[in-house]
Amino acid sequence: MDDLLRGLRAAAEPTRLRILALCARAELTVSDLTQILGQSQPRVSRHLKNLVDAGLLERFREGQWAFYRLAETGPTGPLARQVVDLIPVDEATVQQDATRLDAVKQARAEAAE
């Protein structure tokens, strides 16, 4: 029950909900998230630490980059997906985040060419 409560507390904040929704759609870096959310790197990093510590996000390295994605395993992995499924996709902020995410993914693809 402690894991569930920790996960619910971590998710109960608007920016962290936005991060969960974004990481459910793509594997993202802190830099990606600061660009999409329009928030400072320290603030985004603090939110990411809370979400990783609660088991809602996973952090993994690829070369020099650290990426974040929605957790699929562990005691709170299923909770992460359930929380994301409850976020209304027609919410204006969620739609703005999705548009910005598409732009970040496009820029990443162009840089890789």
PLM feature spans:
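N-terminal helix-turn-helix DNA-binding core of bacterial DNA-binding proteins
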Residues: 2-42, 65-75
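Residues within the DNA-recognition helix of helix-turn-helix
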Residues: 47
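Alpha-helical residues within the helix-turn-helix
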Residues: 35, 52-53
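Amphipathic alpha-helical dimerization/coiled-coil segments
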Residues: 2-3, 74-113
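Beta-hairpin "wing" of winged helix-turn-helix
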Residues: 53-62, 69-71
